[in-house]
Amino acid sequence: MQFLWLCLLSAVTLQFTGTLAFYPIKLPDFTKGIISHHGSVGRRFFTFPGLYKHAHTGSTTLNIRRGPSNYRRDNNYPAQIASPPTAPNTLGINNDGYDFSYFSEVKVGSEGQKMWMLIDTGASGTWVFGSDCTSKACGRHNTFGKEDSKTIKVTDEKWGVTYGTGKVSGVIVNDTMSFAGFELVTPFGSASTASDDFLNYPMDGILGIGPQDPNAKTPTVVQLLMQQKLLKSNVIGINLQRASEGATDGQITFGDIDKSKFSGELIYSNVVPNGYQWEIAMDDLIMDGKSLNLKGRTGIIDTGTSFLILPPADADLIHSMIPQADKGSGFYTLPCSTKVDIKLSIGGVEYTIQPDDYVGNETATKGTCNSLIVGRQILGPKQWLVGDVFLKNVYSVFDFDKNRVGLAARKYAGTKNPPSSTPSPGMFLLHAIHCQKTISVLMLHIDPTSNKAPSGGSPGLPAESGSDSTTNGEATNGATSSPNSSSSVLTPTWLTLAVFFAIGSSLWS
């Protein structure tokens, strides 16, 4: 297995101690036909063909004062901007309009340079594009450097993230980051070079909020918040919005839980033993009421991953339950009208995955869409990468003190088909072997010459029953845990940001 690490580096001499990787996926053909979603056509517009079947045709409509709108930065990346949050220590999460990447505005340096930062629970490292970067990709993003801040301290410590097809690299800098009511002095990576792979990415950097390897020498952004006792409690609550619903209430809350964003109670699952990711045990997958008996699986809960990515054998089984699903050239397609009820059972609760979230855009064959459940062997034989296809349906809580993940059914106020969760007949306690120490990036690649829209593109041990109740009506289940300007609109002819995640420990010492 090849490796990749997205990491916040310490202010000491850093050396690579592992192999780094990038996983491209070539998807089948597409058409430029767009299917309207089932909601109000007037609520949302895109300026180019959508990746999901609910995108619209039509010219850009800007509504500055009210309702969801397609706000556009000087560097011409589209976004569905989140409504200003009302809860304290909360940051709005913007959507790229396709539910593929979620990012927030962070102010960096003494002058408050605005940067769009990918919210990534799959990595603990933080970095931005540096103003000294001359790469083409940097010219299409907001950058940050000496001219933007009086307080920046540039070190000579090298930093880099390498992909199979390119890389981003530079040095470590120290400066302030302001977000969600906090102002924090922190080290982070400043990219002086970046490959063309970043040309169409909306984000100007990554804000890593994954758990840190306890052996790492440098604290992460979240660790600094905790060390300085700036958080009410050492938890982070996240709800992602679904673009097709016209929702703009995506947000991340630092130090608290927003109970208005979910229904029912939060059910917690402990992170697998010795895991340095938000990896938890999963019970099963249920389709139209039938258990697939997918026992012993674990899932890495990752906001930086667009899809539900799982071993090919599991993907084959799931699609065998969907009428007329076809593997074709290696990536599944299914009828655009698919309404199969899919529930992922975690911690004894079945969480619905809406068809709008797993059915992608239409292919060259009328009435046939791409599946956003992707079979790809990038982890262990029983490890899943549980991304936004699932996370749009839940409110997720990441508890750093108790090393656990909490989930509850997401509440979409005033929208159609709200997600639901159903208690399972029994609780399961799944133990999982520690995941391979690998770090990977998976992206869906579309032919750059095409003008067609892309699609929304460790072995387990036997299960045993058991659950532990906690206070405040919560329950716990699981294994015991130890902008620069561009002259033209950037059309995403290849998928901009499918997956950013990190598994294991730091590749630097």
Curated annotation (Swiss-Prot):
A lipid is attached at residue 485 (GPI-anchor amidated serine). It is a lipid-anchor; GPI-anchor. Its EC number is 3.4.23.-. GO terms for biological process: proteolysis. Glycans are attached at residues 174, 361, 484. Keywords: Aspartyl protease, Cell membrane, Glycoprotein, GPI-anchor, Hydrolase, Lipoprotein, Membrane, Protease, Signal, Virulence. Probable GPI-anchored aspartic-type endopeptidase which contributes to virulence. This is Probable aspartic-type endopeptidase CTSD. Residues 486-509 form a propeptide. Residues 102-408 form the Peptidase A1 domain. It holds the Pfam family Asp. InterPro entries: Aspartic_peptidase_A1 (IPR001461), Aspartic_peptidase_AS (IPR001969), Pepsin-like_dom (IPR034164), PEPTIDASE_A1 (IPR033121), Peptidase_aspartic_dom_sf (IPR021109). It is an enzyme of class 3 (hydrolase). Residues 1-21 form the signal peptide. The gene is CTSD. One of its GO terms (cellular component) is plasma membrane. Residues 451-489 are annotated as: Disordered. It comes from the Eukaryota. It comes from Arthroderma benhamiae (strain ATCC MYA-4681 / CBS 112371) (Trichophyton mentagrophytes). GO terms for molecular function: aspartic-type endopeptidase activity. Residues 466-480 have a biased composition (Polar residues).
